[in-house]
From Swiss-Prot:
Part of the 50S ribosomal subunit. GO terms for molecular function: mRNA binding; structural constituent of ribosome. Pfam families: Ribosomal_L13 (PF00572). One of its GO terms (biological process) is negative regulation of translation. This is Large ribosomal subunit protein uL13. Keywords: Ribonucleoprotein, Ribosomal protein. Belongs to the universal ribosomal protein uL13 family. The keyword Repeat does not apply. The gene is rplM. PROSITE patterns: RIBOSOMAL_L13 (PS00783). InterPro entries: Ribosomal_uL13, Ribosomal_uL13_bac-type, Ribosomal_uL13_CS, Ribosomal_uL13_sf.
């Protein structure tokens, strides 16, 4: 008997809707990353993208504990001398709240082509409206 390995053509991928309102940022990101990896499925295979599609709404209403709103910083470098841009988590949540959750989940996924394919299945939106009603996502309570 041989060990089962999933094939990319035969993997069943479902669509799930997650409401981020009142959820802790890190705990939500961890569960989203596990679902994108496919670790919640019995057919999980490390070298095959077995994860589901995730639609996250109300990203601006995510919660953080402690003083992270003022003490946690995101840095990005423009490539020019002296242009290291920094902004706190509070500022980032005001400017682009969906990106905060995307960065948290992306850091938990593999670095490489497979990780990028998994990351593309994450759809994050501010507010409760999303353009994926045609896929009929199932509500997922995390």
């Amino acid at each position: 008997m041989t060990t089962f390995t999933a094939k990319n053509e035969t993997v069943q991928r479902d669509w799930y809707l997650v409401d981020a309102e009142g959820k802790t940022l890190g705990r939500l990101a961890t569960e989203l990353a596990r679902r994108l990896l496919g670790k919640t499925k019995p057919v999980y295979t490390t070298h095959v993208d077995t994860g589901d599609y995730l639609v996250v709404i109300n990203a601006e209403k995510v919660v953080v504990t402690g003083k992270k709103l003022t003490d946690k910083y995101y840095h990005r470098f423009t490539g020019y001398v002296g242009n290291l841009k920094s902004e706190s988590l509070g500022q980032a949540l005001q400017r682009h709240p969906e990106r905060v959750l995307e960065i948290a989940v992306k850091g938990m996924l593999p670095k490489g082509p497979l990780g990028r394919a998994m990351y593309r299945k994450l759809k994050v939106y501010t507010g409760s409206k999303h353009p994926h009603a045609a896929q009929q996502p199932q509500v997922l309570d995390i």
